[in-house]
């Protein structure tokens, strides 16, 4: 008689560290955008930051609703890592440009929060890179023949 297999339940995305980092990234980017808007920063700063907010929100919805498991035509972790790298580069440039000239205090705060966005983006990219590893984190352990027979 077969023994029933235990059902492996995964934690929902909203209860993971990746969700926390993405949500923190979203909040910091929105804060940076608000400071750019209130400080009347140049339009490219606001547009780039707003675009990043939109993309982060879309990835949050994608992972929270489980659409990445339904739409298998894309390799979502790779797209997320590429997005994180582009975001880090763009926000780093915007933040440096916001801090260089003599600008208002609110624009400077937008630049500082932009640097925090870059930090959160790098952390998010590091977490997503773990999914892209081809080799497992633990060393490979050869299973005995009894373990193989139990799974069948």
From Swiss-Prot:
Keyword set includes Transmembrane helix: yes
Record key words, sorted: Chemotaxis, Cytokine, Membrane, Transmembrane, Transmembrane helix
Tissue specificity annotation: Ubiquitous.
Residue intervals of the MARVEL domain: 13-133
Gene Ontology molecular function, alphabetical: chemokine activity
Location in or out of the cell: Membrane
Domain of life: Eukaryota
GO biological process terms, semicolon-separated: lymphocyte chemotaxis; macrophage chemotaxis; neutrophil chemotaxis; secretion by cell
Transmembrane domains' residue ranges: 19-39, 46-66, 81-101, 108-128
Signal peptide span: none
GO cellular component: extracellular space; membrane
Membrane topology: Multi-pass membrane protein
Phenotype caused by lack of the gene: Mice exhibit embryonic lethality.
Family matches, as InterPro entries: Marvel, MARVEL-CKLF_proteins
Function: May play an important role in inflammation and regeneration of skeletal muscle. Essential for embryonic development.
Annotated family: Belongs to the chemokine-like factor family.
Protein known as: Chemokine-like factor
Organism this protein belongs to: Mus musculus (Mouse)
Phylogenetic classification of the source organism: Eukaryota, Metazoa, Chordata, Craniata, Vertebrata
Gene: Cklf
